[in-house]
Amino acid sequence: MAFDPRTPIPPADQPARLDALEAAVRARSDLVPRVGIVLGSGLGSLADDLTDDVAIPFADLPGWPAATAPGHVGRLLLGQLDGVPVVMLQGRLHMYEGNDPGLVVQPVLLMGRLGARTIVLTNAAGGLDPAFGAGTLMVIGDHINMTGRTPLLGPNADAIGPRFQDLTDAYAPALRERLHAAARAESVDLREGVYIGLLGPTYETPAEVRMLRAWGGDAVGMSTVLETIAARWAGLEVAGVSLVTNPGAGYSGEPLSHEEVLAAGAEAGPRLARVIRRFVRELPAA
């Protein structure tokens, strides 16, 4: 089944697309995950900790293109993380790659279709709070969607979720506290703040950084917000963690680069991996 990744995918089209995706995955694995984990730029090493895993390249799944962003391997994996069945995305799809919002969120919706009820989203982000230097880990307490897009535009799929989705607690308070508890147990410093999602792929100007900070943002990136909207629409609980890879434009006086993002991910990735592994191990069974 071939799809153009630029073709709009309204919510009403998602059930049929998810049927095809689920069938393709089930042809390779019958594992029913409890948790879904999305690994952002430079954070893919957690996938190395999976056991009994099955790896499926994005391009092998119907309608999904290969991931093109550096630091995103572009694989869906099913396996055991410290004895807990999980589904993991080693990389993600972005709108700046030319993908429709409905396609960008399909991986998270597929995680729910496969059985995961808890979704952990990670990303690399720029720091808006001057106190959040490179290497800071931040639990996402709330977000501001400045992409100008939503995955819920168009006829609804009532079988998945409501027409009008409440986002009061988009990031589940109980899961946020569990992340903080896991970080304390691992002696990892973990902050909390507001994530602002932009379209990308350009980094922000210094003037935009000042504006976003004035709006209450603590970190800024090019992902996550649409995935959270779709996950909450599908009745999934969401936790999010940003790795601040660089100060916002204008703070340091240095130009920004994706190489800097990947290097920070390599340095801080092991700390984040320890927190997520403990979080997953200690998550109560449904």
Q: PLM features: what roles do these ranges have?
A:
Residues 160-171, 183, 197, 209, ...:
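Polyanion-binding loop/helix "lid" in catalytic or ligand-binding cores
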Residues 157-168, 214-217, 252-265:
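Glycine-rich tight-turn/loop motif centered on a GG-T
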Residues 24, 28, 174, 178-188, ...:
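Generic non-transmembrane alpha-helical segments
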Residues 249-286:
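His/Asp/Glu-rich mid-to-C-terminal helical/loop segments that flank catalytic regions of hydrolases
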Residues 222-260:
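Zn-dependent metallopeptidase/amidohydrolase metal-coordination segment
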Residues 2-167:
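Metabolite-binding pocket within alpha/beta catalytic cores that recognizes anionic/polar moieties
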Residues 172-234, 238:
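Active-site-adjacent substrate-binding region
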